[in-house]
Amino acid sequence: MPNYDLHCHSTASDGLLAPAELVQRAAGNGVDILALTDHDEISGLAEARARAAELGLRFVDGVEVSISWGGITIHVVGLNIDPGNLQLQQGLQAIRQGRTERAKKMAADLARVGIPGSLEGAYVYVENPNLIGRTHFARFLVEKRYVSDVKSAFQHYLVSGKPGYVPHQWATLADGLACIKAGGGVPVLAHPGRYKLTRSQMRKFLGEFKDGGGAGIEVITSSHTAEQFLEYAILANEFGLLASRGSDFHGPGESRVDLGKLPNLAADLKPVWHDW
């Protein structure tokens, strides 16, 4: 079976590697088909696509869209999008608005608990000024030794209920799905195990997701346990969703799993790439 990795990030959003470097690493890891899925951003796709062509690696244009649902942030990956689609571009631009103001509020909140200079410090790690986010603040917190690693930065400062967390209203589920579908993409729920939804909440979301045009779910991803692989495989079949596989790789030393280093999908699942 070809080695698919359909979820990763570059410096166009919050990854550590430039798009071409990311593709190079994927090829070195034996990835056959790679999707670049930066947060609400498609500016890295052309560079990645060009390097993939040079290396003979099949490249899939993608994006990870931020959605607000039930008071939490949920991510939906769009695969096989057309980056030139105007409606997609406008939708992503609308979603990106407000990140800068949110970052200022995060910095002010961190300063109130004795962590000064976080906005300037976070921007040191930002390649795309439109895409400042929590991961950039996390890297600053690691650099200044407030925490030992990025995961700890999120746990202690950057998730709901912690001093550096600022909620933000992203796209609605309907608008996020419409944005992806306008660009011809396949909407796939990213890392469902990360949202801490109850069983009934997850089933409610998947029903709305499917009814709104959602088509797939990440069954195999770096943040899932073996038990969750099985749990989301069952839900994929129950809701008639295509199954996806993606590392959510952000960079060396920060990600649990490297590009392409994932278990295969179970044989009874219909993969998202089935009709490609």
Label for each model-derived stretch:
Residues Q87, E254-S255:
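A short acidic, helix-capping loop that chelates divalent metal ions and anchors anionic groups
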